[in-house]
Amino acid sequence: MAFFRIRILLIFICVAQFAIAQNRGKINWTADGNAYTKVKDGNIIQVDPVTEEETIVVSKTKIIDPAANKALLPQSYEFNSNYTRVLIFTNTVKVWRYNTMGDYWLYDILADKLTRLGKGLAPQSLMFAKFSPDGKSIGYVSEHNIFAEDISSGEITKLTKDGTRKLINGTFDWAYEEEFGCRDGFRWSPDGNMIAFWQVDATKIRDYYMLNTTDSNYSKIIPVEYPKVGEDPSAVKIGVVNVNTKRIKWMNIEGGPQQNYLPRMEWSGKNELVVQQLNRKQQESKLLYCNTNDGSTTTFWAESSSAWVDLNADDPSGWNWINNGKEFIWISEKDGWRHIYKISRDGQTEVKLTTGPYDIDDIKCIDEANNLIYFTASPYNATQLYLYKLNIEKPSLLNKIFNGKNITKEEFDPVYANGRDGTHGYQISPNGKFAYHTYSSHNTPPVKEWLRLPQNTPLNEAKSIEATARTDSTVDVEFVKIKTADSITLNAWINRPKNFDSTKKYPVVFYVYGEPAASTVRDAYGAQNNFLYKGDIRADGYIQVTIDNRGSPVLKSAAWRKSIYRKIGDVNISDMAKGFTKLLEMKPYMDKERTAVWGWSGGGSSTLHLLFRYPDLFQTGIAIAAVANQLFYDNIYQERYMGLPQENREDFVNGSPVTYAKNLKGNLLYIHGTGDDNVHFSNAELLVNELIKYNKQFQYMAYPNRSHSISEGPGTFEHLSTLYTNYLRLHCPPGAK
């Protein structure tokens, strides 16, 4: 997933409408890239993107659960290499964020045989099942151990035997999943004889105990292995188990396992792994080769930063090898911008394929047959996103794909008379011949088309974006650049109310996030909507604004993004306050006497900061699931951006909103779910105690047993939306004056 996109989505429900509009589920391309498969009406079908012809590959009548006497409902599926068998994942349950546990079934298309995997194992306990490359076995995880099941005989081999809740084989603990995107924790060897896997030793990690008080007469303790900032992380190591002998060889990776992270690992040869290692502060990244025969390791490439090193990709699987494994493609910010590099296998030679003062967003496809790399970027407007291509062997001939016109690197221009400014998304076939293209802008609802590459021409002109795009004339959004008092230029948007009259004054609702995990200023349809408001916020006469502060993950240089290092709660809050102050000066129709700020998660923290520290700027704040004290959050995230509290504890204290709670002057509504495994409910209790200490009156809502998204249970969203709307309307009255 894109560097830029994932950080937008990490605001999760705060941009739910935008996410749904912009993102189709991941396309399941066939191996040759000339078609794709999907689930439709319970059947697994194959679709030809050129003719749009649909062919049923697996009929729902063939996948009947004999015990329930009804068809399986595939959550996901995977074919073997020759498309004669398919793994079906169903009856799933959530593990923290995602439904990664459930039942797996194997359907043999030629034999017309359906088999449930994991006989004798607990129902709904299998995770990450996948075919071995030779197609003879299926590997999966159950109850923290790794298994291999022979397809022909059905024999199940338990490859690890020491797995417990605290000693995890083949998957990850809470922190690795949340902060590194690591879930699937094992990889088949190319010959199918071995499995490389992560083992996470969380035995020394203290549990955070959540309390379920709603599901029975007696409360139930829910332990979460959660290493808080300043605490050592889980000890992680990589092993290789022989499927036939069950012998395990552990990789001898230098550095203490609790002072380094191993977030990426893949096979790089028959008896070799490639691994990415980050040190505890995440300021040093090393790429290693591990010999799976003797466990020895060799470092072949490294980079460092005085702030932090981002992971190469948000998707933890795969490695971009080219030239028969002699080189690989890598993304790095080592020159101050996010660029694409070609690196030799031994790490001794590197070629920077993209150059100049701009960031690339994400690699969309490596079409090695045509020496092309397709990637997204936006050199001239950080609120937008476009597709580019480059020739791997001739990177100076960098062309932008835009409305079928190739524009050379020397002709980069932010203005296209016949183009469509906004946010473009692409899913490109493995062979580089087809692309599923989505587009929207602030005033263009989402549209989609299928393209033929490299020509960049629609497969169906009648269904092309040019034929179907329309302008929403009801939208009144203005993108502005704000130059603050300390000469920092910030991007912002203003969403004006319906029937706007510039001679009148309107209340202002400031939506904030502010931390390195997400940005909010996007030229995309729906990104300006307030999903939590019950009713039509524009019809009710509110102006809505948002600002991307320094430190937000936008395409404006590594220096921009990393200026927040050790300064969360400082740089970002200052930028927001100064930017908002400047907006009030620039736009006289904004009513300074009716200003409200709100946000969720990191945005909740920013809301508290602004309300506590700038009491004359904001009259009202609504903070949801905020980190009140940075020392309460997990170590991977907080240490990446703030360092170690053992070395600079004052930065954590000064950056925590609870430090300033005594300054509350305006109206505060604070909301939190008691079952929040991410930002723990103890943040709410700490904040409440501090406000009580100083006799600060406020409104408070705790949602019993709800998680960070406050979405579980009947009526929850309706109640939350009503609460939010009523409070806003009461303390920041709507309408023009």
PLM regions and their residue ranges:
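A periodicity- and composition-biased signal for non-globular, repetitive helical segments
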Residues: 11-13, 155, 556, 640
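Serine-hydrolase catalytic core recognition
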Residues: 206-207, 264, 409, 416, ...
